[in-house]
Structure formats: C-alpha cells, structure tokens
C-alpha cells in the first residue's frame, strides 16, 4: 500500500486556523492521476495540489478537489509556492513559471512585512451573461431576489475557472446566506458546473474594499470555500468591467462568516487593451498528514 505525505497550509492568512486550508503534495510525480484524486478525496480539503516536474515551465501544479480535477486554484497555488520557498526549494525575489491546465502562468515570490508573499498572474478575464432565473438563484442561496444589487449584473466570470459573480446589497444579505448547492446546476443553465461567488461593498474590516463568499459546485465535494484567490481576481476584473472602478487595487476579505478570516490583494494593470489580474497572498504551515492509498 502506497503512502502520501500531505502538508496542510492555510492560505491568505498568517494566523493558524484561519484563511483557506490546502493540501500540498511535494512529490506529485510519484502518483498517477487516479491516485492523486484518491489522495485529494481522503485529505478532504477544498483543493489539494500536486507539485510535479515540467518540461515547459519551472514546475507543474495539478489541483484536485475531493470530487474532480480543477484547471487552476489560487489558494492552493499560494500554499504550494509558500511551502517550496519555506523549504528552500524556491527563492524570494524571483519569478517562476508554473504549468497549469489554465496555461503557463508567472508567479512572483517576494517579502513584505517580514513574510513571504506569493503573487500569481491569472489568466485574462472573460465574462458571459447569466440568463437563468434570478429568483431560483436567490432561493438556492437562501436569500430573496431583493437582496441582489439593483445596479450591477449577475454574470459568469473567469480568470482560469468559471464562477457566477453575484453582487449583493448588504453585508447582512451575505451573512444570512445558507446555500443549497445541489440546486446550482439547474439554476446556472449557461455553465452548470460553475461555482457561485456573491459579494458586497459592505465589509467587516475597515481596510477592505469588498467582501465575498464562495459556494462550490456540487460536483466538487465541498460546499463553501473559505478564501478564494481565483474568484477574487474575477471580482477585481468585474469591478473594472461592470463597476467602472477607477482604482486598480482591491483588498478583498472572505471567510468571516465561517471563522476563517482571510484577505486577498488583487491588482490590475491594463496593457494593449488587455487587463492583467494579479493576486497576492501569504500562507502559514499547519500540519503534516500521512495518508495510505
């Protein structure tokens, strides 16, 4: 029987027990695709990343939820690169290329306030209209359609993974959501496997710009993601595209409703008519588990 060493890191926080936990497997080349899926299922984190050698980049990352493989995962990328830097396998002050199923993406490692920070350039933002029933979506989230923001549209967005961006009127609406994600596929008729990412301009922390929550597709094996890097990147791009935001940097908070307080920094730069979305976060080591497969 094979074993797998799974390191647990919590991303987008410097406090153990907060942020978004991810499993990190340093010896990803030792396992087949089926074995990686089994490891992710038994680890039970929203995502587990497997670090592998790459012929076209500095390294490859593959991401698995308990239910299926993902093209990209922001918090697991932060956790993986933080782990490699902490163990002396990568250096601060350098930019590395990582191969993912969303493409080859640059990742910068830097130090700020005495901590390692990871900056991931996400894929170019894309948007698609939501044509489903707003009342059914509200019902699936445990709120009413009156809780939706009147002036901003519900759309699907992606910087590597598709999610439904749902603007809300208030923090109170965010707090009272109790999702039934089994309803998502029939509500998200345009992209039935997408996740749902509601957000509001009202925040818990005064230094935050936006407050979000992230509810997973029922196919992923989880219900709520505590702090979501890729969806936060989509939120920043959404604010530029639909919110006419003049600012290029956003501090996005998430996880407060479930005791996993975390923050993601999103910065956008426009060049040649394209928007580049950069996501920055730190992480903290939690524990090591040995799983039999």
From Swiss-Prot:
UniProt keyword list: Isomerase
A biological process from GO: biosynthetic process
InterPro entries, per the entry: Phenazine_PhzF-like (IPR003719)
EC numbers for this chain: 5.1.-.-
SUPFAM superfamilies with a match to the protein in the record: Diaminopimelate epimerase-like
One Pfam family, short name: PhzC-PhzF
Active-site residue list: 47
Gene3D superfamilies documented for this protein: Diaminopimelate Epimerase, Chain A, domain 1 (3.10.310.10)
Keyword set includes Isomerase: yes
Annotated GO MF terms: isomerase activity
Source organism superkingdom: Bacteria
Recorded GO CC terms: cytoplasm
Family, per entry: Belongs to the PhzF family.
The protein's name in its UniProt record: Uncharacterized isomerase YfhB
Native species: Bacillus subtilis (strain 168)
């Amino acid at each position: 029987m094979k074993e797998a060493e799974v390191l647990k890191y919590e991303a987008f926080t410097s406090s153990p027990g907060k942020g978004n936990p991810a499993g990190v497997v340093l010896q990803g080349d030792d396992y087949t695709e089926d074995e990686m899926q089994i490891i992710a299922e038994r680890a039970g984190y929203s995502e587990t990343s497997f670090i592998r050698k790459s012929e076209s980049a500095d390294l490859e990352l593959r991401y698995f939820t308990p239910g299926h493989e993902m093209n990209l995962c922001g918090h697991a990328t932060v956790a993986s690169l933080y782990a490699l830097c902490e163990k002396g396998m990568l250096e601060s002050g350098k930019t590395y290329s990582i191969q993912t199923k969303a493409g080859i993406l640059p990742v910068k490692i830097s130090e700020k306030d005495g901590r390692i920070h990871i900056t991931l350039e996400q894929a170019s933002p894309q948007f698609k209209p939501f044509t489903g029933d707003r009342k059914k979506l509200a019902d699936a989230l445990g709120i009413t359609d009156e809780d939706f923001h009147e002036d901003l549209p519900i759309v699907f967005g992606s910087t590597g993974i598709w999610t439904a961006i749902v603007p809300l009127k208030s923090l109170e609406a965010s707090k009272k959501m109790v999702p039934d994600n089994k309803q998502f596929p029939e509500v998200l008729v345009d992209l039935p496997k997408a996740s749902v990412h509601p957000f509001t301009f009202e925040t818990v922390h005064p230094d935050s710009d936006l407050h979000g929550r992230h509810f997973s597709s029922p196919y992923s094996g989880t219900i709520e993601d505590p702090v979501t890097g890729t969806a936060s990147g989509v939120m920043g791009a959404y604010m530029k595209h639909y919110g006419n935001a003049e600012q290029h940097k956003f501090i996005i908070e998430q996880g407060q409703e479930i005791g996993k307080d975390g923050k993601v920094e999103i910065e956008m730069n426009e060049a040649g008519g394209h928007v580049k979305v950069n996501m920055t976060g730190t992480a903290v080591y939690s524990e090591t588990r040995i799983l039999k497969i």
